[in-house]
Amino acid sequence: MRGAANLTSAMEVAADLRQRILLGELKPGARLKIDDVASLCDVSHMPVRVALQALEAEGVLDVYPHRGAVIRAVDARFVRNTLELRAAIEVMLTEKCARLIDKDGLAELEALVLDFEQAAQSQDPLAVVSANLRLHEAINRVAENTEALRVLSRGRLLIQALRVRYGFGPGRVENVIVEHRALFRAIARKDERRAGEIARKHCEGARDELLALL
């Protein structure tokens, strides 16, 4: 039972740290000491160690012997490399989604497209980022490629934190709404090629616009 409790605590610690990183309370380059995190989250050392290992696996932390964990530094190269990799993978997954999706899946995507548009009206970067992630996760899941999803998850939190920090440039959210609608139509028509083209343009636009904000 103690092992299960430690695992639950570790999951809670990891979730807490993710939220703090996302909101900018913990910034790239910050060192996370086990003692400090344990005090912050009111847990023992073991759940903290497990949580830090999980975040390292997600590409969020670098862990060094005798130095502890450090939130990965984020610069233009990191953003460019991460989003170019995302583009390559999401094009593949989106094309497969267009081929495999069923009526229930389409209904879910349509609802998530609308959820994003409602979030956009709030002008809250965190709400927009979260709604965008839910939509793209739903598209990507249809392809049933867990290895691709694992790669996509690496470093994603750090990109999201940049979005929450810097927001979106003029007209970007409006462009995203247009692209989401076009992407949904292509998927609904099972037009794999067009869906892939839109996905690539969508990812490249996100990359270029975020780099311009740095």
Per-range role (PLM):
Residues 82, 86, 103-164, 178-186, ...:
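Conserved amphipathic alpha-helical segments that form helical-bundle/coiled-coil interaction surfaces
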